[in-house]
């Protein structure tokens, strides 16, 4: 769908790098996001958020520096950061007159029909009640080793969008566009304004992980777009 006005159900994915700063959570950004979601709801849109940030916020609360790569430490950071993340959402969205809900997922939920249908029914009921569902991977228990991890929330957002019949998937990032090469490394990088086909050379040019505490980047966003389309 290319006509935004016709989109009724919208999934918005927010990455770690847009939610956090070097000092901690970006509260101003979350308030701005809340205002924008409130506006979309006034237009009759249903909005579902897929939010990263738990590991990053947990790491900052523990005053960790650099990427958190140890699995046990990532799980600990997620357990610490998830309630901090939801507190920020509750506060900002509450000030904008909205109620939010937390939905934590593992890959198992979407891979089994019964649990998937239970999830879908829950989200449908939340939307019916006018609640904004905020979905995140349950990083405290999701691990690639036991096959319960999505890998990144870009992929999760695409899967959620397809499973709940969303009309539009928006992925927010701190990079202003897709480039033909990493603009943080190459000054001559040029923006790619429209992608008709997701090719291997394009994915390769998109680079790797986006932030120290996140798992996504432009590469995973292209892969997510491929899933969603």
Question: Predicted regions: what is each one?
Answer:
Residues 1-229:
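Nucleotide/pyrophosphate-binding catalytic subdomain
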